[in-house]
Every structure is written in C-alpha cells, then in structure tokens.
C-alpha cells in the first residue's frame, strides 16, 4: 500500500483530535481508580491505538499516529501520562505542586526561578513507584532487543506535555529533550528529569500567560531510538514569512537538528513549489559547527566542520524533493500545515535514510488568512493553491 493510499483511509481531523486529548487527559488524571487504564504505563508507537493517544502527550501522539500510517518514524515508546500521574499520587506531590505554582508571581523573575527550582527538586528527589519503574525498564529492554543492541541502545528521551503541539498553542521547546541516553538507569533518571521540566520557570510563565490551567497539563515522555543524523532540519508546509500554502520551506544543516532548532547555526534554506516540487530558491550558508554523537563517552558533542564541507549544501536537489514529498504526505495526514523535524540517518542507505522526528501544527499563519504576492502569482497558481488548500479556501 502506498503512502497516499494509507493517508486517504480515514485521515484524522487534527483539531478535533487535540480537543479530545485535553478532555481525556483531565478525566484520566482525576479518576485514577480506573486501574485497567492506569496499567498502561508505557506504550510502543506501533501498539498505541487512537483511544490511547490521550496518554501520550502531543509529541508522543503525533509519533504514534505517523507510525500507524507507516511513515518513517524511528522505533520507540512513550512513558504515559498515567505513569506520571501514578508518580505524583504515590509521592503525594500533586497538591503541593499545585499550591506552590498557584502562589508564583511570574512578574517577579527571581521568585519565579526560586519556586521553579524548588518544585523540580521535589520531583527529582522522589523515587518512581516500583511498578512504574519496572515497566519502563522492561520497555527499554524490548526496544534494545528490537534494534539488536541488548542493553546498549542510545535513545532520545523527550518531553511530551499534554498542552504541547496544539493548533492554538506554540508550546514547542518549553520542556527538555535529552540525547544519546544509554542504559536502563539513565533512562529512568532522564524520564524523571523530563517530568521535572514541566515546571521550569519558562514553562510555568508560558502557561500562566497563555491561561492554560495547571491541572490540565500532564507529562508523557518519548523514549526513541537515536538517529545518527548526517543532515537534519525543519520543514514547514507553508512559507512562514507570508503564510503562502503553495510553498514548502526547508532549513537544514549538518549533523543533529539541535543546531538548527537552537539557532546555533544559520542553516541552508530552500524554498520549494509544493505542486511541482521545483526549488525556487536555495540559500546556502557557511555552517561552522555540527552536533554529532560521541559513541565512546555516550554523549552528543559540538564540533567544528571542515571549511570545504561547511560551505557545501547539506542536501542534494533530490533530497530536498524527498523531504518535500514526505512533508506533503504528513500535511495531508493531519489536514493542516505542519512544522516538521526530520533527519537523514547516516547509518542507513541513501534513499532509505529519511526519518521523521516530530510533526506539529504550524501555529502562526493557520490562525490567519494566508497572504500571497499578487504581482508574482499567476491565475493558474491561484487555482492550484485553492485546489490544494480547501481549508484555506473556506476561510
């Protein structure tokens, strides 16, 4: 079955999907007596059903949904919101945290930082319930076995909050991600760190300013096979400068995508026609550094790129088009413009090395009417744009 055939079979409506997430998160947290539901402390992407998505947070639900559509998502599992809920109840932290957050004066930066540090210390100081820890360890061992690296698989441990990746809330980057984590003990420790990152000063302030109720927000954690990225970046299925949905914009650089996402390098930038997949403009930058794995010391390091390679495009024309094809498929899957993180895995053969790390709704222009350049858009382009974007046409 082709990707198109897969996507055309009952594509989910992302807006109704995320609305149901919020309702389910709240219900599942405040009714922990449903023991059969709480037993789902971890779920592998491939085994998660749509009714399980409320347990996975925004990032985790998106990865599970794309994995179910046979898109190229690295194998992994989620430590569910029920594991986090069980931890809070077993440690008697929920009421304490809620009361402390309610008292925070976000206008007082020093006080916000102090309260944030205290809350995170409370979480980091408490042990996981024995059953939760046992399930997480078992799931990591299964993941290692699936990839043929018993006990030694490097993984990314990534926060997946329930207010994350919503169409009307740009929540990205508010919690923590940890790369090249190896071993059961380290996975357990970094899961706890992800839970604690729900209460960074930045995240508390963001929720307060966005009127997001604290008791509506829970944390899932993604544990996913680490990609040894040759090249990585971001693809937007509209032009972020003007909202034009007939274009795809790609930012890319050498190595892991953190250099692009963090702004550490000025990435190569490609503007592509979404219909014809023609590269309209390629702006190639001097990319001085890259993030790469240090396999010996089990960490990610930043290293200088040799001058010749730094000045070269990090994507060929064919690779740019391959990124765009997948980006179009993902946009069709979710039926709204997407902000996609991707990588080319150096350990896989060319043509089979494209991997999806994350996709979330674009949160700026989807709330507005897209603008176009009347002086450059032909009548046919306008017709094609309407045919491609029925949602935009109804606005």
PLM region spans:
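NTP-handling and nucleic-acid-processing catalytic cores
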Residues: 174-276
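Short beta->alpha transition motifs characteristic of CBS
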Residues: 252, 357-364
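A short, polar/charged loop-to-alpha-helix boundary motif
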Residues: 257-264, 363-374
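N-terminal beta-alpha lobe that positions the nucleotide/phosphoryl donor
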Residues: 38-220, 311-318, 325-326, 331-335, ...
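Extreme N-terminal basic, low-complexity initiation segments
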Residues: 2-8
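Short, Lys/Arg-enriched N-terminal segments with co-localized hydrophobic residues
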Residues: 13, 27-38
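Conserved catalytic alpha/beta cores of large enzymes that bind or transform nucleotide phosphates
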Residues: 247, 251-339, 344-345, 379-395
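Intrinsic disorder/low-complexity segments
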Residues: 16-20, 24-28
């Amino acid at each position: 079955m082709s990707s198109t055939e897969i996507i055309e079979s009952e594509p989910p409506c992302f807006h109704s999907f995320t609305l149901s997430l919020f309702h389910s998160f709240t219900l599942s947290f405040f009714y922990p007596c449903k023991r059969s539901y709480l037993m789902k402390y971890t779920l592998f992407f491939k085994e998660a059903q749509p009714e399980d998505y409320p347990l996975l947070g925004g990032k985790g639900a998106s990865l599970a949904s794309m994995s179910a559509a046979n898109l190229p998502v690295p194998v992994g599992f989620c430590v569910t919101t029920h594991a986090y809920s069980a931890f809070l109840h077993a440690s008697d932290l929920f009421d304490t945290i809620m009361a402390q957050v309610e008292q925070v004066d976000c206008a007082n930066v020093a006080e916000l930082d102090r309260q944030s540090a205290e809350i995170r210390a409370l979480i980091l100081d408490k042990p996981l319930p024995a059953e939760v820890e046992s399930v997480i360890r078992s799931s990591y061992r299964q993941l290692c076995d699936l990839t043929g690296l018993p006990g030694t698989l490097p993984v990314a441990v990534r926060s997946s909050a329930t207010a994350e990746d919503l169409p009307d809330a740009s929540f990205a980057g508010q919690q923590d991600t940890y790369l090249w984590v190896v071993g059961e003990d380290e996975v357990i420790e970094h899961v706890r760190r992800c839970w604690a990152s729900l209460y960074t000063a930045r995240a508390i302030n963001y929720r307060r300013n966005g009127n997001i109720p604290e008791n509506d927000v829970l944390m899932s954690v993604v544990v996913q096979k680490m990609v040894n990225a040759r090249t990585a970046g971001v693809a937007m299925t509209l032009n972020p400068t003007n909202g034009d949905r007939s274009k795809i914009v790609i930012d890319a650089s050498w190595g892991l995508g953190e250099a692009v996402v963090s702004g550490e390098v000025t990435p190569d930038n490609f503007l592509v026609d979404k219909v014809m997949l023609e590269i309209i403009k390629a702006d190639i930058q001097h990319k001085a550094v890259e993030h790469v794995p240090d396999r010996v010391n089990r960490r990610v390091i930043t290293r200088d790129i040799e001058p010749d390679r730094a000045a070269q495009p990090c994507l060929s024309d064919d690779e740019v088009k391959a990124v765009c094809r997948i980006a179009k498929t993902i946009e069709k899957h979710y039926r709204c413009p997407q902000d996609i993180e991707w990588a080319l895995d150096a350990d896989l053969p060319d043509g089979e090395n494209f991997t999806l790390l994350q996709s979330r709704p674009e949160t700026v222009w989807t709330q507005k009417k897209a603008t176009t350049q009347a002086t450059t858009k032909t009548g046919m382009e306008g017709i094609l744009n309407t045919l491609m974007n029925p949602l935009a046409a109804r606005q």
